[in-house]
Amino acid sequence: MPTDTFYRLPQQKRDRLLAAIHGELSRVPVTELSVNRIVHEAGISRGSFYQYFRDRDDLVQYLLEYVDSCFHGFITAAAPACGGDPFELLRRFLSSIRAFGDDPVNRAFCTNLLAHLRANGGVQHCRSNAFSPEWIEGMFDRYFDRSRLNLAEPEDFKLMTELMQTVLQGAVAALFMPGADADALERAFDRKLLILQRGMLKKEAQADAC
């Protein structure tokens, strides 16, 4: 976590530092991040940097929290326009991530950050608590109607949202793999959502499965 000193920085100075970090991570992997290059680009001293972050892991954790805050902002802005359809929100979310990654600098940044996460226990191992089950439940009930879901057991809602998250996270990670075919990935993502919406068994087979 960044120190309180970082959060007390004027917004302009904080944005300049974040832009320098973004630029550095778009050029090199996390393991090759240069504090010297970051502070030079941001126009601050090396000592100041370590007043804001303890080490590289601290910096990566902050980047994850920053990304999560951007995701929160997108969800809050997009959800009201989805007509009460949570699957439409996921489609719009992936489209926005794809558009973000169309910029080569953004794409390199995300590719390097995701590669670091995969090498260090995966995304969930490193994430903040920004997308806790409580946050997801509150967000869903604010913008969507839970009564439209086919919930057979009390725990089904949590399991359903976990499935949706898994499909979304897999699609986002795949978008930033070398040689990714974004059109094909988006089509496959849409098909997976349709399968989740309708279920996997034909109606005549559902009775046999119960």
What is each model feature region?
Residues M1-V28, R37:
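Basic, helix-initiating cap at the start of DNA-binding domains
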Residues K13, R56, L63-F71, F93, ...:
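Hydrophobic/aromatic residues within well-ordered alpha-helical segments
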Residues R16, F53, V60-C70, F74, ...:
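Alpha-helical DNA-contacting segments of helix-turn-helix folds
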Residues R16, R27-D58, Y62:
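Helix-turn-helix
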Residues Y62, T76-V105:
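Hydrophobic alpha-helical connector segments
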Residues A78, C82, A108-L117, A171-G179:
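Secondary-structure edge/capping motif, primarily at the C-terminal ends of alpha-helices
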Residues T111, R118-G170:
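Amphipathic alpha-helical packing segments from all-alpha helical-bundle domains
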Residues G170-C210:
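C-terminal peripheral helix-coil segments that are non-catalytic and often amphipathic
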